[in-house]
Amino acid sequence: MLMYSGEHAEEVEKDQAGTIRVVSGISDDHFLWKLCEGEEFMTPEVILAFTDNGLSELSLRFHRIIRENVCPKEFRDIKRQVLMNNWEGTYFDFDDDKIMDIADSAKEAGCEMLVLDDGWFGARYDDHAGLGDWVVNRNKLKKGMDAIADHVESLGMKFGLWFEPEMVNEDSDLYRAHPDWALTDPGRKPVMARDQLVLDMSRPEVIEYLYESISTVLRSAKISYIKWDFNRSLSNVFSRGLSADRQGEVAYRFVLGSYPAIQLYFRKKC
């Protein structure tokens, strides 16, 4: 098991003597690292396990390794709550009252958490605009995010909220202000998926923006859960924050930038 969240490759080879050789690591695609004199590069760790009791036992061993050594202890053993998510019930068409009505129904159904999905922020009335503008849409939620959270809490449930931090729409205030923050090839039409581009998570200023904007929302209401989405793969892997001879490092630096972005929300008080 490779301890890495980006593109990876595994090879298994058995030679004429019956010896099995396993190689696991970063994929050769989109990876070329310029290592200068005196610098170091650390490859991702690999976790190995062995059993002669079949795949089920091997899977259980990996589960135990991850639970006991990788999962943050403060979250590892907490009760996983039964939740209701509004997405397929409303898509982008909702307001305060509709979400509160759904919360009431969720309580009656025995749910323990309500998660407000995509569409609560920016000019987000469909999937063509607003992504990246992490500010509550007060035209939809006139009572504010805190009113919804308080209503859900009053029912004895927890409240969760949807984010997709790594993504941005061209039709957004963020992209209009910082088009260079998106991964795009100079001089080429960008490849879109779900009408969105991918932010360049290798850039510290992008991480700082995401932390500040999302933290402001999290501080505005009692939010107990984050649904962190990722609705497209990387393409046009080119960073305007790196020189031409270091573009092979972008995909790897993207992953390295994403890790602290996630940890900021759990290790620091918002």
Model-derived segments and spans:
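An acidic-aromatic substrate-binding cleft motif
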Residues: 61-113
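Active-site neighborhood of glycoside hydrolase catalytic domains
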Residues: 137-154, 175-270
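Active-site mouth loops of central-metabolism enzymes
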Residues: 22, 85-101, 193-209
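Core alpha/beta catalytic barrel or barrel-like domain that forms the active/cofactor pocket
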Residues: 76-81, 112-123, 162-165, 225-236
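Aromatic- and glycine-enriched glycan-recognition loops and surfaces
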Residues: 90-176, 183, 208-209, 254-264
